[in-house]
Amino acid sequence: MPARILVVQEDPDIAAYLVSLFRQAGYKADAATEGPDAVEMVQASRPDVVFLDLALPQRWGPRFYSWMVTQPGCGNVPVVLVTDFAGLELMVPNAVGTVDKPFDPVLLLALVDRALATYAKGTPDTPDTTGAPAPDNR
């Protein structure tokens, strides 16, 4: 079964590009352009890798990440940060890298491979996995 990639990206054009790239490479990929939609997608099916835009409106990027790592089976899901701030992955547990526009498809796919190799599905969770409720939609 192909690995599942969740793209959480405010810009629908960027989200569509990333999903298309990942699907063409043989992955199962879906996108959410808003935090609440991303929460629903994780609740429905655990992703193997998340590409996360930290600059979502209403601080949904950090809120989504903080919530996701508390969900059963999601504590070690690797995250690639879509941000202008190189090196930010050093401050975010489970982050395996950052990407910025313009996107290099070879780099994007290499980050997916690295994430999957580093965090094999089924790896025990290290963060608290108490199953925190979904963040408030406000």
Swiss-Prot record:
The modification 4-aspartylphosphate is found at residues 13, 53. Keywords: Phosphoprotein, Transcription, Transcription regulation, Two-component regulatory system. Transmembrane segments: none annotated. InterPro entries: Bact_response_regulator, CheY-like_superfamily, Sig_transdc_resp-reg_receiver. May be involved in regulation of gene transcription. Belongs to the family of response regulators, and members of this family involved in the regulation of gene transcription are two-domain proteins. This protein contains only the N-terminal phosphorylation domain and not the C-terminal DNA-binding domain but it may bind to Rrf2 protein and the latter may bind to DNA. This is Protein Rrf1. It comes from Nitratidesulfovibrio vulgaris (strain ATCC 29579 / DSM 644 / CCUG 34227 / NCIMB 8303 / VKM B-1760 / Hildenborough) (Desulfovibrio vulgaris). One of its GO terms (biological process) is phosphorelay signal transduction system. Pfam families: Response_reg. It comes from the Bacteria. Residues 4-116 form the Response regulatory domain. The keyword Phosphoprotein applies.
